[in-house]
Amino acid sequence: MASAFSLLTAGGAKFDKNRFKDDFQLFEAKKRKDRKGKSKQIDTLATGSALPSSLDFFGDHPHPQHKPEPEPESESESDFESDSGSSSTSIPAPPPQKITLTGAEPLPKSLHTNLPSLVNHESHSLTSAEGGPLLSALSRANIHSLWGVQCAVGGCLLEDRDTLCVAPTGSGKTLSYVLPTIVKLREPARKLKGTEEGKGVRALVVVPTHDLAVQIQGVIKAVTMGRHWRSMVLTKATEKAVWESAPGEAVKTGEDGDSEIKDGEDSGDEEEDEDDNGSTGSVDEFAPKVSGNPEGLGIDMLVATPERLHHLIDSRRISLARTKYVILDESDRLLSSDFLPQVEPILSACSNPAVQKCFLSATMPAGAESLAKKWLKDGGVRVVVGVKDSAVTTVDQSLLYTGSESGKLLALRNLISSGQLPYPSLIFVQSIDRAEELYKTLVLDGIKVDAVHGGKAKTKRDEAIKDFRVGAVWMLVVTEVLARGMDFRGVKVVINYDFPQTVPSYIHRIGRTGRAGRPGKAITFFNIEDGPYLRTIANVLRSSGCPVPEYMLDMKKPTKNEKKKLAKAPPKRKAVGGGGRDLNREAGKKKKQMVEASKKRKMLERKGKGGNEEKNDDEE
């Protein structure tokens, strides 16, 4: 049989073997010594370096199929980034950290790291028919053991204790409440049809953004696969299914009401979302009708944003009187002034005497913590993983002075061209307008980029996030709407293009990388206008063990009023790039507004004159 090299060079072509020695050796037979020290000739085509099928022009070379080597199992949590919600990639556990429990004695015992301790808990032991499918689903999702926060929070919840958890980003908080909630529910609502226990919203998860709600729903589906658990995200399309499962007084009496809603931080154009059955709905379909759920089939787990859920409660369309488990994920954000007017009525509506609450976040300011304890029985059990309100230690953090807005763009382009910004990456900016500006600029640079912010429709945001997860998009330009809870395990670098307004904002932003024990990198740009707040962020870097120049730590501390002012509104900045046609962008906006106002005045004047002329005609 002719060699592969002969086949490729047939036809009289001459080839300089010395000049292209390295390339030539790819097709040469190699020699290696066996265990006895004798030389042994190896045909490269029979080994792993077989001739690619694209080069096998004559089709006479075998293409052996090599079985992949089995990957060693490791203690890991599932990577819930794929559409199916599971992954076969082993994920390293986060670095071990001290876990502190405080609260009323006796304090609950933490679970063991092995999974059977979850389903065989003395307070809520499951049968093999109940626990077997859960363990199988966890195995399929590549979850082989529990992590520290999951052991601590799981132990608290399974002993029926209200819990307040503060744990770093990427430490596994979502599973820490999803798994024990499923164990305590025991059976899906479908198996409890016709009983009181199988009615209503059985467990409720409240989150600040729609994007996080969709992600949590993916986690729930992954670990409940095989037992027909009923879980859903509350959207315009699923409203009807929700209030049919847990009807309020307005639904029972047939009253009508307004269904228009927008979700605070999750604002944007509402789109028709698919419900459980794949159907879509419009606003007109949500007026109370004859129930399409006559058996009163309950919802095992409902994931909702505050504004839409509060609207259903306020209009008496839904009842949460049967809800036994309430979880506030990113609770410090939900207990802030933006969401508190909606969250308090939601908590009050969960009037079941046996209701159990769990509040979790990566950051918990003193004000939010004291407010949370008022809603927890006996103040709850406080679980702190590592150092409270600190950044994740697996992220290499740095601060970069850019001088101006044009300097920011230049620095970003330099990072990209020098290979210091590997894909996939997240770029945080402070507003919707700036996100769109930077997105359009990077598109013109030929980068596969997309933008996600509150001004985009939900379906467009979901599509952009999906493309980012599968690698169709290399970079995402995002606002704070994606800073909390979103799990992008593959993100290697986070760029704070605009300086974060608060320490919690910084911690949550950089927490999108370095998740589940993986290394990550965060670079924060700053200019002159960010100087007064630089020391605050520099202290976070120092507490995480990252090097910080001394001059930053010696800078004047910002006053409380300055911090409050920055938290309420970001500093005004020039347009992205800081020059060219964008330099007078604000002036152009004002001029346009003045022209439009002038046109309106003239139009009103004309209408007024026309009306007077008609009156004069009538008088005549």
Curated annotation (Swiss-Prot):
Domain of life, source organism: Eukaryota
Enzyme class per UniProt: hydrolase
Gene Ontology CC, one term: nucleolus
Position of sequence motif DEAD box: 329-332
Residues binding ATP: 167-174
Chain intervals with Acidic residues compositional bias: 71-82, 266-277
Catalytic activity: ATP + H2O = ADP + phosphate + H(+)
Compositionally biased tracts (Basic residues): 562-575
E.C. number(s) listed in UniProt: 3.6.4.13
Keyword DNA-binding carried by entry: no
Localization of this protein: Nucleus, Nucleolus
Domain Helicase C-terminal: residue ranges: 394-556
Subunit description: Interacts with the U3 snoRNA and is associated with the 90S and 40S pre-ribosomes.
Physiological role: ATP-dependent RNA helicase involved in 40S ribosomal subunit biogenesis. Required for the processing and cleavage of 35S pre-rRNA at sites A0, A1, and A2, leading to mature 18S rRNA.
Protein name in UniProt: ATP-dependent RNA helicase ROK1
Organism of provenance: Cryptococcus neoformans var. neoformans serotype D (strain JEC21 / ATCC MYA-565) (Filobasidiella neoformans)
Organism taxonomic ancestry: Eukaryota, Fungi, Dikarya, Basidiomycota, Agaricomycotina
